[in-house]
């Protein structure tokens, strides 16, 4: 992982290019990303930044965390996240520094991680795109049933990982190689091409892409 930002998904809109093409984008607001701890190879065995984002009342923070924020001389945040660093990345940064959207640039490709919308208990048709069974021809009860879930005496059990009904959504998901269309430094906004996981208002973590596109190779 490389240095990144934590933001809040605001929703989707579209912007137009000079040629008149419409590009769907997701607006992400980056709210007060502060470095609370700098981890080094000497002290921790690896290089990383611990980042707090957002604001939280000091009365809502337990004493160990309050002491941690006080040591870094930063306001309490909603949560802490850690970003692993390469050997040459941001070597001069220190605890208390604020990270802003200008660490990314327009046209850069990023990975975005977020918590998907929870959809409750779902059947196999909705959860795994199973086809439905016959509507008629003697079928009166099993239109959306999954069908057989295994064999008989051998193996005498249901295989692990069998696609069945269950909880849908409410899991962390990462979308890769999303292009940054616009960086708004004044309002601390990132406009990222396409849809991102999660509901509006949800937390998203933006990092440099772990893959290279063909045109970048």
Swiss-Prot record:
Domain of life: Bacteria
In-chain residues carrying the UniProt-annotated modification N5-methylglutamine: 153
Family of this protein: Belongs to the universal ribosomal protein uL3 family.
InterPro entries noted in UniProt: Ribosomal_uL3, Ribosomal_uL3_bac/org-type, Ribosomal_uL3_CS, Transl_B-barrel_sf
Functional description taken from the UniProt entry: One of the primary rRNA binding proteins, it binds directly near the 3'-end of the 23S rRNA, where it nucleates assembly of the 50S subunit.
Name listed for the protein in its UniProt record: Large ribosomal subunit protein uL3
Oligomer status and interactors: Part of the 50S ribosomal subunit. Forms a cluster with proteins L14 and L19.
Cellular component GO terms, alphabetical: cytosolic large ribosomal subunit
Organism, scientific name: Coxiella burnetii (strain RSA 493 / Nine Mile phase I)
Keywords from the UniProt entry: Methylation, Ribonucleoprotein, Ribosomal protein, RNA-binding, rRNA-binding
A GO term for molecular function: rRNA binding
Post-translational modification: Methylated by PrmB.
Disordered: annotated segments: 135-154
UniProt xrefs under Gene3D superfamilies: 3.30.160.810, Translation factors (2.40.30.10)
This protein's record includes keyword Ribonucleoprotein: yes
A biological process term (GO) from this entry: translation
One Pfam family cited in the UniProt record for this chain: Ribosomal_L3
Phylogenetic placement of the source organism: Bacteria, Pseudomonadati, Pseudomonadota, Gammaproteobacteria, Legionellales
